[in-house]
């Protein structure tokens, strides 16, 4: 069974508010060679008899988190379109999860991402990956301080329920 079929079978056990045909289409849209660099999506390589290595880092940010985030971006876009709604995602990151979230949400209609990260506290690769992403709905914000300072800002917004509702904010605390 290919990864697309397996993902659909598992997701369909838990997602009952998206028609099966639509869910299958979203899974097929997500797990493509164009996104993951290979038709196998998660290639399995035999190292020796009975020992295999599965590659989970073929996505756009080279992080295993792309496996879930890419699907999440498509699910968000689908759901928001059905509801004629918009969403502002406000998060904090110290590395690859922020990049995976941004690359998953780039170009998605009705979604904007505001991602805080500690200024000069991430690897050069992670900083370049995030801050070179040019997309009108992705906003990278470098914060003087450490990751905990970024997280504190997200928690403050998360705890202001009136503000979150008015601004249509989904806050992501542990990225």
Regions found by a protein language model. Give the residues of each.
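N-terminal entrance/gating region of PLP-dependent enzymes' catalytic architecture
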Residues: 4-62
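Well-ordered mid-protein domain cores that form the structural environment of catalytic cofactors
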Residues: 51-107
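Small/polar-residue-rich loop-to-helix segments that shape phosphate-bearing ligand pockets
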Residues: 116-173
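Conserved small/polar residues in nucleotide/adenosyl-binding loops
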Residues: 1-5, 173-175
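Predominant activation on well-ordered alpha-helical scaffold segments within soluble catalytic domains
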Residues: 8, 12, 70-73, 151, ...
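Acidic-glycine-rich active-site phosphate/pyrophosphate-binding loop
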Residues: 41-49, 67-68, 158-165
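Glycine/threonine-rich beta-strand-loop-alpha-helix active-site module
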Residues: 86-136
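Generic secondary-structure signature for well-ordered alpha-helical cores
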Residues: 12, 16, 32, 77, ...
